[in-house]
Amino acid sequence: MSSQQQKQPCTVPPQLHQHEVKQPCQPPPQEPCAPKTKEPCHPIPEPCNPKVPEPCQPKVPEPCQPKVPEPCQPKVPEPCQPKVPEPCQPKVPEPCQPKVPEPCHPKAPEPCHPVVPEPCQPVAPEPCQPVVPEPCPPTVTPSPYQQKTKQK
């Protein structure tokens, strides 16, 4: 565009006076050229501003969103579910069974087996302890006799 404007005024005056035309030809093209170059300069920095924040915005939220929810969800529910039910179930029945039959086996296994497991499971180990020692001491001495006689 600027090349066409320079050619038009420059081509006409040189025909009249080449020497005189050179001087006035230089300043006129500078005047119209100056404002024209400034105008397109203004819109250039404007689109520059949105270009900078645009790539910045998507870069920040993208890595933030997947990093926070992804590790949070699987870490919380996975270890919580297996850890709670697994140790809870075996811990309750395991200590109840070995604690009661251990002292009962040497003292009186026959009468203790049917009486101990029944109240131990529904009631708890508390009533099991006072009931076992009381009947067990008197049956300690006859227990070997009963076993021998029953075997015969």
Swiss-Prot record:
Family per similarity comment: Belongs to the cornifin (SPRR) family.
Sequence repeat coordinates: 27-34, 35-42, 43-49, 50-57, 58-65, 66-73, 74-81, 82-89, 90-97, 98-105, 106-113, 114-121, 122-129, 130-137
Gene Ontology MF annotations: structural constituent of skin epidermis
Keyword annotations: Cytoplasm, Keratinization, Repeat
GO cellular component term, pick one: cell periphery
Tissue-wise expression: In squamous epithelia lining the nasal vestibule and in the hard palate.
Subcellular location: Cytoplasm
14 X 8 AA approximate tandem repeats, as annotated region: 27-137
Induction notes from the record: During squamous metaplasia induced by cigarette smoke exposure.
One record GO biological process: keratinocyte differentiation
Function field: Cross-linked envelope protein of keratinocytes. It is a keratinocyte protein that first appears in the cell cytosol, but ultimately becomes cross-linked to membrane proteins by transglutaminase. All that results in the formation of an insoluble envelope beneath the plasma membrane.
Name the UniProt record assigns to this protein: Cornifin-A
Disordered: annotated span: 20-40
